[in-house]
């Protein structure tokens, strides 16, 4: 499959908002201001190196305190190397296979997992504590080439004010979106260029099957769905319910985003509202799972294994929601109040097996593009 340009979605906006508070401090905790390793530890040069390099997409964030805790427990300092969006970062690792940029890769999700595995990017390693990870997230449980780290749900978000003002119930299912009362209300991202756009497409494949998803999209197109390149444009420009969309005078009260988007709207509003301005149609969700793996040819294999153990520790898992706006995969890790109060609980998300995605992804995207954006 060709290169997919992917926006990680809600975390892109969150990353910008917390860059000063978290991002700069993270670099300080991980190394020099340019992202280099602290002097004297030799970078990621071999078994004796005390630096372990984590290669990730641009939306990786962790609190400095948690990264310092890892150093305290293991003696290793984390160097974070951000390599673009998820698809771009994966492509770079494929191009440097065998001589990787770092020791651990974080951020490949279930829509692209097969590409990473088929290219032999990872050395198998069963992380300590993997038995505490929800079984549904362990998609490579036989070979342990990757370790599940987080989950998120791609769902329709709606502008509460719009539907209240119109005295119209917001849609709750895929079937609702093709009803005439929701004509010209939805904006989605291009499935060929956007992670949430692809996830939404896969959700319709799961819901309607190989024989029905194209007919569904014909009806959605006839009902006035708008398609834009990426999440940033859809959510922060076209969607009327977001702070950015309100400023840009967006006119679409329905958007493909994440179940964690409403808490983000609350967190960064000044003053914080008592209720989220947006809601989630929980019957339209596709489950996204992100993984990390020990890169084949890693210079600091021992450090990489220690980092994989830490990524599924309770300390790191509890730190993720307010830094990357994702859900922990370790059972029993509590979500922060912001999530439980303003977020949506998705009990039955749509899923597609990674091997099925691998066999059909290119064909699905090509068929979708010809049908919807031609």
Positions of predicted regions on the chain:
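C-terminal motif of bacterial Sec signal peptides marking the signal peptidase cleavage site
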Residues: 25-29
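Early extracytoplasmic/lumenal segment of secretory-pathway proteins
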Residues: 31-34, 42-115, 237, 374
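A structural signal for short loop-to-beta-strand junctions that line the ligand-binding cleft
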Residues: 100-105, 123-160, 175, 185-191
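Periplasmic solute-binding protein
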Residues: 110-121, 141-169, 197-207, 287-293
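Ligand-binding pocket segment of bilobal, Venus flytrap-like solute-binding proteins
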Residues: 196, 203-283
